From Swiss-Prot:
This is E3 ISG15--protein ligase HERC5. Residues 1-13 have a biased composition (Basic residues). Its main location: cytoplasm. It is an enzyme of class 2 (transferase). GO terms for cellular component: cytoplasm; cytosol; perinuclear region of cytoplasm.
């Protein structure tokens, strides 16, 4: 029978190995097998065992066969003219070891055991080639071989590569030309991979999101990147019009992609027509195989120079490319430039029963060989696309139900596998992508939130997940991996409730922040772009996660290097989020502020570190390892910034005192004739010549004197300056200098705000001194009534004033310009009839050359308004403003001033008048002899609350030296009542302004109290 079958085959011309036709399959109801080119002996041998065949694998000159049970691999030599009838060699693993799958290269074979261990063999000697045990510690789920390199995908989602690397086909850079030690492809770390494939010297990986990465040899464009330069790191293939790819196949120097919609794309070498484009040209990018458009391709395979495609609806296999050995099944050995159906004879096309659901086609191509296997699905052909473990709703329900059952240990292993792997966790929550959908993020975060919420209902699962995140996943976060989908684990983790448990801040949140801080700028930008898409509530929750961690760290702050590193990472993380918020303006600044800093931060240490950091470019290692909180000003509320400013002032003053002391000691010791340095900056002024005296003395002092402690005395008055005299000094001085009658500033429209004049009546130096005085007031922790608009404080911080600032300075003008901007009428020019010239501060000027003849219209009106604002706030006052700024920053540290926002800076310089008189009464303190219910005190408060606002402000001047409050005093307005026993009702009320102490005689009548209070208000100046 066997001999007759062979003869019959010869007569029909279908058995010779070099011929094109396939061996006719036996009429088996169970399975059918076709070989192209035909090899009668091999065909018969395979067909007899087809029902138990688990895998067939081709490579140039060899066919490997794996049967059910996985006891061993049979390797057949495919030699021309042999018919493939030689006795195959058999490879077996160790005792009791089963084989799952096999793949072959040009000279090596890779065998994967059922328990996920890979073994490599030499194809000639069949000897086991041992490599280091790194893969023996992993469970491998997929393997693939190039000619001289291998890839392996682990269950944890890690991709390993080893072998030849002359063209970068390992994807690990060009560190070595080859290696026998498997290397992790770091570039794809964290990417949930679905499939891997290898060609002659190039490699490809398909992610679960449908993205394809390629690397290695590229002389024919087989990487699909649009050029022919080889790549030693995986690169994303683009230009697929958002098609989701479901399968990739690598030929020798060409590649093929199959999408979820059944479209076939090919690229790379086209010399033999293996791309199917009716051309022999190479393609550098994925190109659709037009001949198959309209059909749904369901399976593809690539040989060395040919390609196969199966259209299940038709029951036909199409082939194209090299037909040198008859591998196309076209009845000959000619090349085929476009897809044509495979034939089983010269006149009969292969036609499978496409309607059946019981059978499936297995299509194998390798070298110059094609194999078609039509078998029952129940035959259990090897699954070559085993995927990494992922999580879904069904898995969660099973986990919860498995507690203390026989499956419990298995369940715990599953939890550990998924929550220890960034790729597995990310792959669990991928969104389905439609072909027309553009999605920067492929995650279904709502699904993730729901599953996490369900999981955390069980404490044992919560604890186990926390342990997995801490011990494994966070240590494997892919900060080196540039693909965006590798970074999606960073989007996912903050959704995990364990990250928001306060006890986990050090074990989970800090490591997360440290990894993000190690990212490249490109990867960091991807994260920030994602954060910018978050809803307000989600974004706020993310900010709070890191802010809470900072607060928790401050609770245990001991200045150790580790804690400095922790806080540095957390603050850098908040800095990134704050940068995103500045663009989005989604959350108020207060969300980022850590109020606890005010009481937990050592401000003296903080200021000293700032000095050390500024003193040298190459800061000492000790300074570098210490976090400087004020480098992250967004975490400081205004009170903390003020405290930092005042601490800086105090240290400067103490430094000057110490320097003066050392100088005095040296002079005394050496009996030198030099003058000793004064430890203070002393001003003696006359009330009726206040401005004159101040300016004269300022011009005589050295710059170094200005930053000493200020002591002020008024001529002819007795008053030791412990703060109160300074307050009154600045109050009176600025009150005179800002008066419209004095002429130093202009008040547009008689408004309450003042601005610099276009043509000042004083020399520029006076504005310099005014800036010095403003800085001197701030340096000495004082507030002053300076009715500048917010625009001034913006300019001090190098920010541009806006139309809103002009509305504050000149309400009428601002309103008119707004009306101009809002008007969209067609008769705009007739209604407004204005030109690019302006009248401001009694001066006319052109905003642009020849502006008086250029009409403002709908097209240029925004430019007109912009130039108008710029003229008022910048161009018209440039000279005098620059002098003011120079004087101000001569006194104040610009770096610290720029920690403030404009509104905050205005509050700290100008103070506040948001009085709360009820709180003022509530905060009152009483020395012995008085209490809140004492008749005199009751009468005093009754009389006080009857006063007008202006009278109350005058009383504050009498009590404190100023009518303005610092930010820190808004809720702490205090007055201390003292009862001098020797005083009687004829004595007036007196005040110790430095300490807000009121000496109040025990008046017995309401009339006496009111008279005494009025006398104090009307005589609220002077000391002694």
């Amino acid at each position: 029978m066997e001999r007759r079958s062979r003869r019959k085959s010869r007569r029909n011309g279908r058995s010779t190995a070099g011929k094109a036709a396939a061996t006719q399959p036996a009429k088996s109801p169970g399975a059918q097998l076709w070989l192209f080119p035909s090899a009668a002996g091999l065909h018969r041998a395979l067909l007899r065992r087809v029902e138990v065949t688990r895998q067939l694998c081709c490579s140039p000159g060899r066919l490997a066969v794996l049967e059910r049970g996985g006891a061993g691999v049979q390797v057949h030599q495919l030699l021309a003219g042999s018919g493939g009838a030689r006795t195959p060699k058999c490879i077996k693993l160790g005792k009791n070891m089963k084989i799952h799958s096999v793949d072959q290269g040009a000279e090596h074979m890779l065998i994967l055991s059922s328990d996920g261990k890979p073994f490599e063999y030499d194809n000639y000697s069949m000897k086991h080639l041992r490599f280091e045990s790194i893969l023996q510690e992993k469970k491998i789920i997929q393997i693939t071989c190039g000619d001289y390199h291998s890839l392996a995908l682990s269950k944890g989602g890690e991709l390993f590569a080893w072998g030849q690397n002359l063209h970068g086909q390992l994807g690990v850079g060009r560190k070595f030309p080859s290696t026998t030690t498997p290397q992790i492809v770091e570039h794809l770390a964290g990417v949930p991979l679905a499939q891997i494939s290898a060609g002659e010297a190039h490699s490809m990986a398909l992610s679960m999101s449908g993205n394809i990465y390629s690397w290695g040899k590229n002389e024919c464009g087989q990487l699909g990147l649009g050029h022919t330069e080889s790549k030693d790191d995986p690169s994303l293939i683009e230009g697929l019009d958002n098609q989701k790819v479901e399968f990739v196949a690598c030929g020798g120097s060409h590649s093929a992609l199959l999408t979820q919609d059944g479209l076939l794309f090919t690229f790379g070498a086209g010399k033999h027509g293996q791309l199917g484009h009716n051309s022999t040209q190479n393609e550098l990018r994925p190109c659709l195989v037009a001949e198959l458009v309209g059909y749904r391709v369901t399976q593809i395979a690539c040989g060395r120079w040919h390609t196969l495609a199966y259209v299940s609806d038709l029951g036909k296999v199409f082939s194209f490319g090299s037909g040198k050995d008859g591998q196309l099944g076209n009845g000959g050995t000619r090349d085929q430039l476009m897809p044509l159906p495979v034939k089983v004879s010269s006149s009969e096309e292969l036609k499978l029963e496409s309607h059946t659901s019981e059978k499936e086609l297995i299509m194998i191509a390798g070298g110059n060989q094609s194999i078609l296997l039509w078998i029952k699905k129940e035959n259990s052909y090897v699954n070559l696309k085993r995927t990494i473990p992922t999580l879904n709703e069904g898995t969660v329900k099973r986990w919860i139900a498995d507690v203390e059952t026989k499956r419990w240990q298995s369940t715990k292993r599953e939890i550990q596998e998924i929550f220890s792997s960034p790729a597995c966790l990310t792959g669990s929550f991928l969104r389905k992508r439609r072909t027309t959908e553009m999605m920067p993020v492929y995650l279904d975060l709502n699904k993730a939130r729901n599953i996490f919420k369900e999981l955390t209902q069980k404490d044992w699962i919560t604890n186990m997940i926390t342990t997995c995140l801490k011990d494994n996943l966070l240590k494997r976060l892919p900060f080196h991996s540039p693909p965006q989908e590798a970074l999606e684990i960073f989007f996912l983790l903050p959704e995990c409730p364990m990250m928001h448990i306060s006890n986990n801040w050090e074990s989970l949140v800090v490591p997360f922040a440290k990894v993000v801080c190690k990212m490249s700028d490109q990867s960091s930008l991807v994260l920030e772009e994602y954060w910018a898409t978050l809803q307000e509530s989600t974004f706020s929750k993310l900010v709070q996660m890191f802010k809470t961690a900072v607060i928790c760290q401050l609770d245990y702050w001991d200045e150790s290097a580790e804690e400095n590193g922790n806080v540095q990472a957390l603050l850098e993380m908040l800095k990134k989020l704050h940068r995103v918020n500045q663009v989005k303006c989604q959350l108020p600044e207060s969300i980022f502020q850590v109020d606890e800093l005010l009481h937990r931060l050592n401000f003296f240490v903080e200021v000293c570190r700032r000095y050390l950091w500024k003193m040298t470019v190459d800061a000492s290692e000790n300074v570098q390892c210490c976090v400087i909180f004020s480098h992250f000003p967004f975490i400081f509320n205004n009170l903390s910034k003020i405290k930092l400013l005042h601490t800086d002032t105090l240290l400067k003053i103490e430094s000057k005192k110490h320097k003066a002391y050392l100088r005095s000691a040296a002079i005394e010791e050496e009996r030198e004739s030099e003058f000793a340095l004064r430890p203070t900056f002393d001003l003696t002024v006359r009330r009726n010549h206040l401005i004159e005296d101040v300016l004269n003395q300022l011009s005589q002092f050295e710059n170094e004197d200005l930053r000493k402690e200020l002591w002020v005395s008024f001529s002819g008055e007795i008053g030791y300056d412990l703060g109160g005299v300074k307050k009154e000094f600045f109050y009176c001085l600025f009150a005179e200098m800002i008066q419209p009658e004095y002429g130093m500033f202009m008040y547009p429209e008689g408004a309450s705000c003042m601005w610099f004049p276009v043509k000042p009546k004083f020399e520029k130096k006076r504005y310099f001194f005014f800036g010095v005085l403003c800085g001197l007031s701030l340096f000495n922790c004082n507030v002053a009534n300076l009715p500048f608009p917010l625009a001034l404080f913006k300019k001090l911080l190098d920010q541009m004033p806006s139309l809103e600032d002009l509305k504050e300075l000149s309400p009428d003008l601002g309103k008119n310009l707004q009306t101009l901007l809002d008007d969209e009428g067609d008769n705009f020019e007739e209604v407004f009839y204005i030109h690019f010239n302006v009248h401001w501060d009694r001066n006319d000027t052109n905003l642009i050359p020849n502006g008086s003849s250029i009409t403002v219209n709908q097209t240029n009106k925004r430019d007109y308004v912009s130039k108008y604002i710029n003229y008022i706030f910048n161009d018209s006052v440039k000279a005098v403003y620059e002098e003011f700024r120079r004087g101000f920053y001569k006194m104040c540290d610009e770096d610290i001033i720029k920690l403030f926002h404009p509104e905050e800076l205005k509050d700290v310089i100008v103070g506040n008048t948001d009085y709360d008189w009820k709180t003022f009464e509530k905060n009152a303190r009483y020395e012995p002899g008085y209490n809140s219910s004492h008749p005199t005190i009751v009468m005093f408060w009754k009389a006080f609350h009857k006063l007008t606002l202006e009278e109350k402000k005058k009383f504050l001047v009498f009590l404190t030296g100023t009518d303005r409050l610092q930010m820190k005093d808004l809720n702490n307005m205090k007055i201390t009542f003292c009862c001098p026993e020797s005083w009687n009702e004829r004595d007036p009320i007196r005040a110790l302004t430095c300490f807000s102490v009121l000496f109040l005689p025990k008046y017995s009548t309401m009339e006496t109290v009111e008279e005494a209070l009025q006398e104090a208000i009307n005589n609220n100046r002077g000391f002694g």
